[in-house]
Regions:
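Internal alpha-helical scaffold of NAD(P)-dependent oxidoreductase catalytic cores
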Residues: 1-68
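NAD(P)-dependent Rossmann-like dehydrogenase/reductase catalytic/cofactor-binding core
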Residues: 52-131
Length: 131
């Protein structure tokens, strides 16, 4: 474990499910999101060779930015810019393509918009940005 930089610490019994869910978000969902991106690129006509090169480059950049800036400041894209019109357009396109992907996009966009509020205000506001 120390080779990963792991450290021992105590997690209260009542928090273990949340702790493990955090690990799922940090590791298990990354391949799911990567696969989804590849699927969308393929459907939109991006050649496989290009998407296979694009994906690791984007993931590496995201991880680098998280390490350097922290997760909140590393956020990019339409939610970070509060480009609600583009978010709606992408959402509508995804709803025509695949409902589970559209639902994931909607849920993750809400989390991203909450992060924007944290970045701008230093705390989550009671009135989130509407999508």
């Amino acid at each position: 474990l120390s080779s990963w930089g792991a450290q021992c610490f105590e997690v209260k019994a009542e928090n273990k499910l949340l702790y493990h869910a955090a690990a799922v978000f940090a590791t298990n969902f990354v391949p799911v999101l990567a696969h989804t991106a590849l699927q969308l690129w393929q459907t939109s006509g991006v050649p496989t060779e290009i998407s296979q090169n694009l994906l690791p480059a984007l993931l590496d950049n995201a991880v680098h930015n998280i390490k350097q800036l922290g997760s909140v400041k590393a956020l990019t894209g339409p939610a970070a810019r509060k480009d609600i019109a583009l978010i709606h357009q992408q959402q509508n396109s995804l709803e025509k393509f695949d409902q589970p992907i559209a639902q994931a996009y909607s849920a993750l966009t809400q989390l991203a918009l909450a992060m924007v509020e944290l970045k701008n205000k230093g705390k989550r506001t009671k009135k989130p940005i509407k999508t």
